[in-house]
Amino acid sequence: METRTAENTAIFMCKCCNLFSPNQSELVTHVSEKHGEEGVNVDDVIIPLRPLNTPENPNPSKGGDEFLVMKRKRGRPKGSTKKPSTEEEVVENLVSPSEDGPLATEEGSRLAPSSLECSKCCRKFSNTRQLRKHICIIVLNLGEEDGDAGNESDLDLEKTYKEDDREKASKRPRAQKTEKVQKISGKEAGQLSGAKKPIISVVLTAHEAIPGATKIIPVEAGPPETGAPPPETTAADLVPRRGYQEYAIQQTPYEQPMKSSRLGPTQLKIFTCEYCNKVFKFKHSLQAHLRIHTNEKPYKCSQCSYASAIKANLNVHLRKHTGEKFACDYCSFTCLSKGHLKVHIERVHKKIKQHCRFCKKKYSDVKNLIKHIRDMHDPQDKKVKEALDELRLMTREGKRQLLYDCHICERKFKNELDRDRHMLVHGDKWPFACELCGHGATKYQALELHVRKHPFVYVCALCLKKFVSSIRLRSHIREVHGAAQETLVFTSSINQSFCLLEPGGDIQQEALGDQLQLAAEEFVCPEIDVRKEEACPGEAQPEVGLRELVVPGDAHAPPPGPLATPQSESSSLSPCKLETTVVSSDLNSLGVVSDDFLLKSDTSSAEPPAAAEATSDTQHRDSAQTQGEEVTLLLAKAKSAGPDPESSPGGRQKVGALPASESDSSTCLRANPTEASDLLPTVTDGGDLGVCQPDSCTPSSEHHPGSTAFMKVLDSLQKKQMNTSLCERIRKVYGDLECEYCGKLFWYQVHFDMHVRTHTREHLYYCSQCHYSSITKNCLKRHVIQKHSNILLKCPTDGCDYSTPDKYKLQAHLKVHTELDKRSYSCPVCEKSFSEDRLIKSHIKTNHPEVSMNTISEVLGRRVQLKGLIGKRAMKCPYCDFYFMKNGSDLQRHIWAHEGVKPFKCSLCEYATRSKSNLKAHMNRHSTEKTHLCDMCGKKFKSKGTLKSHKLLHTSDGKQFKCTVCDYTAAQKPQLLRHMEQHASFKPFRCAHCHYSCNISGSLKRHYNRKHPNEEYTNVGSGELAAEALIQQGGLKCPVCSFVYGTKWEFNRHLKNKHGLKVVEIDGDPKWEPAAETPEEPSTQYLYITEAEDVQGTQAAVAALQDLRYTSESGDRLDPTAVNILQQIIELGSETHDAAAVASVVAMAPGTVTVVKQVTDEEPSSNHTVMIQETLQQASVELAEQHHLVVSSDDVEGIETVTVYTQGGEASEFIVYVQEAVQPVEEQVGEQPAPEL
């Protein structure tokens, strides 16, 4: 409507919608039609606006338009080509030139603050130019093409804001534009932003313009009810508002398991803002967006009062103080933001324009092109609509609402790159695969992080196939190399395996002693790589990545870096051992060298070594050609000095290789060829071990990029050579329960079972309120608290309203309020700064894994340690060699046993114990109350454990322990042992108050405690008889030691537990054989042969052991024939000596000593013991592999003379320890060495 003609008349305005009219009756009709339901008074809504006197024009020659233009204080933005428009300035002042100045100034100042606020996201701006370029204003109605007629005013409003800059003011009446601006500038703007409809759901629809894409469409609630708000609204406002809604899109599960053990995510989460209903795919971008609504600006400048909600904006601002700017390469343009420089180059120099498909217009910005198409072309047209959909994808608003679909499994992804990587999963081969566990990755970085999780790499000594655990290695040897000796092959494989050590990992020197140090000195793992020559000599093959061999003691070697072995640690190695000829002879002796690797050394030697290599190359060229393939072994020069070693003819060494099918397997070679040849002694002799044939054992990987990537990752990792002693030491520290799937070690079975379920995906705990399931009970408990409870943990800081159901999130939030964690942490490698310690730790572990933990500790100012890959490390007892879990109660009780402390004491008697549970069980003896009732038979018990054991009797498979004499079965082993007392023919222990008798003193004491608690313990039986008397009454004497047992089952149990033997009757004659190896028993078995009653028989046994070449690997493989030979030898000298003198001959592994104390039949055998397996760590000499030690005694009364028989060594150089055996106590204490003889 036109208002210029009413110079002296009043103009009426509707306060509800800011509608102007010179006729009051028209506004009355308007209010009754539009605002009648609101119950407003017409006189209060319609107000008259009367013009004031216009001040004198200082320049009468110029009109009011020019006067308003001259008042503009802000000029053109830097770099802008737009000219000032008088119409825009009139819009900014919100008045017409015909109106009086004072009224215009007052009205403009009153409406200006609200006019600079976005009606969609409520963000405020300092000027109209920023508001017009705001993303919400530009794309406000991009998704409202099909809107109803009630939104026409809003559509016109947006068109006003998105009006093209080139259109002049004369095209549209000035008053009409003023009216439209006021529609969002006045009071209703706040109403629109405050009455935003909440989102109740999210709908996914297929995108019309892009195949394979899905658009996220939020569904808003219905229109709010007009009328007074309910009284509950005030109470609801008091609840802390989270500010966003979270939606989970269920992912389609895989129809068949993937090659990887991982399962894809079952849900895809998206988020919506509760204030402006915007959709976000990532939570971090939503959190940054929410700061706009909360006016939170945590990033503050330390030099001025500037603050920002986004950290990147603060970084740009700081360049104002530092003077750092980005300069254009084509002109003198400079700016503070790298993004602004990119836009400048595209617009000014590259002349990149966005062309309209329907006319000849072109724009420098996609947003302006979208605005042009909507204003000048019909959005309802099909082609126009498709063009708009494509252009929206070039904006942040359009990309934010787009998901990408997999057309095979219909899974959805937040970005196109993840979808493309996922498509590789449906192929035949993973692009990046792990050869140890079969894990597949679609990124090289993901494979690199995955391989670092494997603590060990076990290599088969025959076929060089790699395994993630020793369990799979044993299974492989048993299934594929069944004809070979399993123990010998397994030991050789352990010696060729290695452990992957991350810098700062959890294999520490204080835990493993000097084992790693010795392994590093005796072995240098060569960094090897592949170079296979094709039939075409002119075609070059790409390098896979050369591995570096650190040569200690070399004068030309570079200083040791983070991954290099220190020169001082391995100075005993001679550099001549690493010559090419030595390596080639080493490889030929083994016969199992793969052609996949190159041997590279960081040496900068001159031409003489190269000439020697050339000579060696000439000598071995013919032998290499007979193998059908050539393998290049290269001692390369340093990267920074010397010519390319590949181009040097003297830098090549050809040796024999394996077939092509084994070319992708790796091995670690010893620097000493003699040690390497000893690993597989029967391979070169053509024995049973033989080289694995290609058809019988094919490596897991073929020649494809995944295998190459895995080898490159393996080459870049730090390694330590493994051996049997180091392996046993690691298992003693970290536990002997090994995970088959990843090689991790555990101490306790409950932890091991829980870990295995992470690989098998066996979920035992299910949520009763949703479909959630978890592996552990704690995860389920945390889920219930977070998702299904109204428990909120509030921040205790004054003035902070933060609350969360997760205690871990609250702990992370509390760091914001601490001054210590507000400091910035800088990466020592790339100098990138982080605000939290966890962020810099994750950054270093991901991007700079070579940084040691000491460096990270210095950066953070405290000692830190990454999560152990092997497992939880145990602590050694300060009094003995036993290991216990770190900070565990078992260690404390063990130390109390050494110190004789029993802190838990009974208040009713003198009983004391070191365990609280034992005290609780003891207190049940003073109580007659039985509170635990069996629901099957009604029997009552005092403790829960007793009830649990009793319930096993009601199950079919509960009685697993059977008597070997009668049909008795028991649910527990102690019950069976108690039953076996009934079958004893001789019972030397008898009660003085009843007819009870038994053959064990402990059973009689238990009888007194239960049946005669007030009587003193007294044995009225004959007590323990001498060995001869017990034998006369049917007892059995141990053939190894002097113990005699009254029953056969006690005798068999003694042989199995103490000596590892079992009785096997062959044709009626009893024979002693080594007991079958069980998982609980150690891998090294000690075989006790027979009795020897004089020195002569002992010497004969030693000679027999020398002929049999007894070693630790073959000790448990001796057949009964060899045992019988030794028995016959010992019996040769037994006729001329006293039969009362009893000694033992034992065959032991290298490095052990056995001390046997001679006793007579009159002495009670329970007062002494046989000490075995005392490791000679204090010896001044090192034992070779074939050393054997047999120790016996010549004195009858006591040990005064010790005879030591050795093979290849001086007996005087060994230290022998003797210790008296003690009676068993409640807590077994580790044996302490006695003074040396």
Curated annotation (Swiss-Prot):
Q: Where is this region: Disordered?
A: 50-110, 147-188, 551-576, 601-671
Q: Which SMART domains match?
A: ZnF_C2H2
Binding locations of Zn(2+) 9: 827, 830, 843, 848
Q: Which residues bind Zn(2+) 1?
A: 273, 276, 289, 293
Bias category Basic and acidic residues: which stretches? 156-186
Q: Where does Zn(2+) 12 bind?
A: 934, 937, 950, 953
List of residues binding Zn(2+) 11: 906, 909, 922, 926
- Name it: Zinc finger protein ZFAT
Q: Which organism is it from?
A: Mus musculus
